């Protein structure tokens, strides 16, 4: 079982000719809503990868909650661990200009109310894979890492978005997944040694005994374990929208580990899923199905 403890949002997206200046009103051409939040996105990706998934998080008692959870429900994700709170459902207000530039305001809402006490709803047990991100209170992420270890579960921590104080508990996770920017920032916070990123990844893995995975967008993915270094190339694609690629990677990676794939195979499968997610607009709607990912993997080999 994969247990995702994380954020659930509804994204409110306005397409505008150009981004407004303070005090200015600009015209828009389209408005859409879409379920989001790193936790929910990753839970759906793990489910589409073929895993059984339980989501632990919170939404509001408002009209946004049902839509925020709609695709998770369709994907047969167990939502028994999702609380209803008096806070609003988490929202991201997004304006996208014709040139692709955007501005985003994220209001955590109910996500900020996910406290360590809620972790009892995860029902952690030996062999589970616990998937975490930094969009809920960091004290809850820290507590989840401790409780998962005590239960004998495997932990995957996606260090997004970057939060400096998260550097203090990175080494509690069995697998740390970061993008280039995040890893470089954590590397500074942790004073990692090495002339380049790969060397600093080796330094982290060697010091902590953990496995660190760094996604490189179009350049693929690198991973360092205490004893080896892996690099997996990316498929060549022309991206339409990269918004859900990182979350898709994380969900597929956790599902692949849970199903017993070796690290290199898990990285290749997650990388293929992440690249396919770039071929459609949106985060959750773009997450590919397992059959499409496995077909893409066969085509590359």
What are these regions (language model features)?
Residues 129-199, 219-221:
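Conserved beta-alpha-beta core of the PfkB/ribokinase-like small-molecule kinase fold
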Residues 164-167, 189, 194-301:
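Conserved phosphate-binding/catalytic region of the ribokinase-like
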Residues 58, 82-84, 94-129, 134:
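Conserved phosphate-binding/catalytic loop of the ribokinase/pfkB sugar-kinase fold
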Residues 124-125, 170-171, 206:
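A short, aliphatic-rich alpha-helical micro-motif
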Residues 71-86:
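A glycine-rich helix N-cap at a beta->alpha junction
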């Amino acid at each position: 079982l994969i247990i995702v403890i994380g954020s659930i949002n509804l994204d409110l997206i306005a397409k505008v000719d150009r981004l407004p200046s303070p005090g200015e009103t600009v015209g828009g051409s389209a408005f859409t809503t879409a379920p989001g939040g790193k936790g929910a996105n990753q839970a759906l990706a793990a489910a589409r990868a073929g895993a059984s998934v339980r989501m632990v998080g919170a939404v509001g008692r408002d009209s946004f909650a049902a839509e925020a959870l709609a695709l998770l429900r369709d994907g047969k994700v167990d939502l028994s661990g999702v609380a209803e709170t008096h806070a609003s459902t988490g929202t991201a207000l997004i304006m996208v200009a014709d040139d692709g530039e955007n501005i985003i305001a994220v209001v955590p809402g109910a996500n900020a109310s996910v406290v360590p006490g809620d972790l009892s709803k995860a029902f952690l047990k030996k062999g589970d894979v616990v998937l975490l991100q930094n969009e809920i209170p960091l004290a809850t992420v820290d507590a989840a890492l401790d409780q998962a270890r005590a239960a004998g579960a495997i932990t995957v921590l996606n260090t997004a978005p970057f939060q400096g104080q998260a550097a203090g508990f990175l080494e509690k996770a069995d697998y740390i997944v970061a993008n280039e920017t995040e890893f470089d920032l954590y590397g500074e916070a942790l004073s990692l040694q090495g002339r380049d990123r790969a060397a600093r990844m080796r330094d982290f893995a060697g010091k902590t005994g953990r496995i660190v995975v760094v996604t490189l967008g179009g350049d693929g993915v690198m991973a360092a374990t205490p004893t080896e270094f892996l690099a997996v190339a990316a498929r060549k694609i022309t991206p339409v929208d990269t918004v859900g690629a990182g979350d898709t990677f994380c969900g597929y990676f956790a599902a692949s580990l849970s199903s017993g794939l070796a690290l290199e195979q898990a990285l290749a499968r997650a990388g293929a899923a992440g690249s396919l997610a770039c071929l459609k607009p949106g985060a959750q709607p773009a997450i590919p199905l397992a059959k499409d990912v496995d077909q893409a993997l066969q085509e590359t080999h």
